[in-house]
């Protein structure tokens, strides 16, 4: 009986340890996804050209996508409020497609990358200042 109790206790401890390790792994996955989704790239006024900082961020995202090979993402193109709705929708699309093309060139499969343009419709900052406009000229990434 003592041996059976010892084996049962050992199994319970092992199960607890495995559950704890799984919870830690799950927490790390959630944190990595949040980091992925919370890091936008930004653009200059009236431009879809990638800055060196944007390229660095996209390289990090490509590395994450290569280790999380089943994940698909949506790249959202956003603009500041200057310009017509139609123009900003087109510019937002160019921004999303520029980011998509760069990720493809880094080895990410195009089938995993979706794009959408929101133009000026979803500002990150509703202020009417250059600082607010700068925050709104972005590509945002969500994990599908």
Identify the role of each PLM range.
Residues 41, 143-144:
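Generic structural signal for short, solvent-exposed loop/turn connectors between secondary structure elements
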């Amino acid at each position: 009986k003592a041996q059976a109790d010892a084996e049962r206790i050992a199994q319970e401890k092992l199960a607890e340890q495995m559950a704890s390790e799984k919870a830690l792994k799950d927490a790390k996955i959630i944190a990595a996804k949040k980091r992925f989704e919370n890091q936008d790239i930004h653009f200059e006024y009236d431009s879809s050209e990638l800055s060196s900082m944007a390229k660095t961020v996209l390289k990090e995202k490509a590395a994450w996508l290569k280790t999380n090979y089943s994940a698909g993402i949506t790249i959202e193109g956003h603009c500041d409020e200057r310009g017509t709705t139609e123009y900003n929708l087109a510019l937002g699309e160019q921004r999303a497609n520029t980011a998509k093309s760069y990720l493809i060139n880094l080895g990410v499969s195009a089938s995993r990358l979706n794009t959408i343009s929101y133009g000026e419709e979803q500002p990150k900052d509703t202020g009417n200042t250059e600082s607010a406009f700068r925050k709104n000229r972005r590509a945002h990434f969500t994990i599908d």
